[in-house]
Amino acid sequence: MKKMKKVLIALFVITTLSVTAQESVLLRLNYTKGDSFLVTTESNQSMGSQGGMNMKMTMGMIVADVAEENIKTESQITSIVMDMMQGGMTMNYDSNKSDEELDQMGQMLKSQFAPMMEAIIYNTLDYQGNMIDTKLDPAIPGMEQITNRSMNAINYPKEKVSVGSSWSSEDENQGMKMTTKYTVSSIADGLVTLDVSGDMNMSGAAGTGTIKGKTTIDISTGISNNSEIEMTIATQGMNITGTTKITVSKM
């Protein structure tokens, strides 16, 4: 009986050590030239009595080049569907509809969105997911912020991570500074799941906010293939809440 107990304890220790070894992974982008992906972003925002917005956007991304130090991608928005209510007015837009199917407000929104859908977004990233350069052709002011968020990019740490590991990144764009913390909550079946939390601060004390959620990373490719983030923002006497879901699938 004692011998059997010792054997069971030994097996338990070996199994535990084996699992621990498997749970230490190095997160890196692992693209191949010619890879193509479909990025789907679904977001909704509520401003209480002020209104709100629901939007679904799809974007195609192609890996144009894979070099020793960086990766170059080319992306283009393929569809936008939006419903917005503001000041008692409802506005709808669907890029899949013809001009005849759009109402007057929809046609006005098309004049704003159509140039975005024609633009090509050129991104250069390093293997840790840091954005080195972003260019748009033709250039459209403000579009970089939309596309960078939609790509669901995460800056990976230099060292390997295991369950409980955490790291932070900072980003500033158009007067908004965002600090995001990532914590590894599980590693299983070739996936790393991260708990996401963070704070937002707008310049000039215009507002503050928080974010929280989860994202899942495919270890083999380094792609954040599924993400769901909740946010709250307090600005100019308004409380804004919203959620953003992003899925990335290989085509």
Predicted ranges, named:
Residues 76, 81-117:
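Mixed-charge, low-complexity intrinsically disordered segments
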Residues 22-91, 163-251:
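Acidic, serine/threonine-rich low-complexity disordered tracts
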Residues 1-27:
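Bacterial Sec-dependent N-terminal signal peptides
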Residues 12, 46-48, 105-108, 137-138, ...:
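Short secondary-structure boundary micro-motifs
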Residues 92-96, 126, 218:
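Acidic/polar residues at beta-strand termini and the immediately following turn/coil
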Residues 111-191:
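Solvent-exposed helix/loop surface patches that form functional interfaces
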